[in-house]
């Protein structure tokens, strides 16, 4: 399936283009649109309605990045890290620069005493679960979705980039949209891939896509 990166400045119609591409690529499988902020999610919903006679298409799902990680990647395969289906939600209580000393594979690295996923380790856990389950996380996504669209990729950081790399290596269609001049937020404060931001981050995605083609 196609892998695409669109670098678009504010006001260039990137939301229209993303939604139009999604509608044109509908198949018997679902399509997933992911964005970082709730504001971005609402913008996608409104644009999709405009292009589909005022209603959201039943085969198009829209989620924020953390909802995607929690519901589509972590919860279905939490048995690979905990004994019971005990994971609740994602905790954003970690302070900037907080060091996590638990080793990879130790459930306490990813999960708080309240059974919430540590936000800084959410994408790392998704990556770990896919690896530990021999690719079941990605295989499930391939079964459910034909295309995954990720808006606001300039806000991704840390292990997010490794997980996107895994998506780009899959049989899914992947469509990334970003604007390095609008990098306002960061999904986490992990030091992983800390040298990749702004223009360097988008160049990183360009290189990844070139490798997969």
Segments (PLM) and residue ranges:
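Loop/turn-to-beta-strand initiation segments
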Residues: 30, 146-147, 171-175
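Conserved ATP-binding/catalytic motifs of P-loop helicase motor domains
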Residues: 74, 78, 154
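Conserved catalytic network of the ASCE P-loop NTPase/AAA+ motor domain
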Residues: 25-26, 139-141, 167-170
């Amino acid at each position: 399936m196609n892998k695409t990166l669109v670098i678009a400045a504010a006001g260039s119609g990137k939301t229209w283009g993303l939604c139009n591409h999604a509608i044109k690529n509908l198949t018997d499988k679902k399509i997933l649109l992911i964005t970082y902020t709730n504001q971005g999610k609402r913008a996608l919903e409104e644009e999709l309605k405009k292009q589909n006679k005022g209603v959201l298409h039943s085969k198009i799902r829209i989620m924020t990045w953390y909802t995607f990680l929690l519901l589509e990647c972590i919860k279905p395969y939490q048995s690979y890290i905990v004994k019971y289906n005990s994971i609740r939600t994602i905790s954003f209580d970690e302070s900037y620069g907080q060091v996590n000393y638990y080793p990879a594979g130790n459930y306490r690295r990813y999960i708080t005493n309240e059974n919430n996923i540590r936000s800084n380790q959410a994408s790392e856990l998704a990556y770990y679960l896919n690896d530990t389950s021999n690719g079941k996380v990605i295989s499930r996504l391939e079964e459910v979705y034909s295309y995954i669209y990720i808006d606001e990729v300039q806000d991704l950081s840390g292990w997010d980039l490794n997980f996107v790399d895994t998506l780009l290596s899959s049989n899914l269609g992947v469509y990334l949209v970003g604007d390095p001049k609008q990098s306002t937020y960061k999904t986490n404060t992990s030091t992983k891939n800390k040298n990749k931001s702004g223009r360097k981050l988008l160049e990183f995605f360009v290189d990844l896509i070139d490798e997969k083609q």
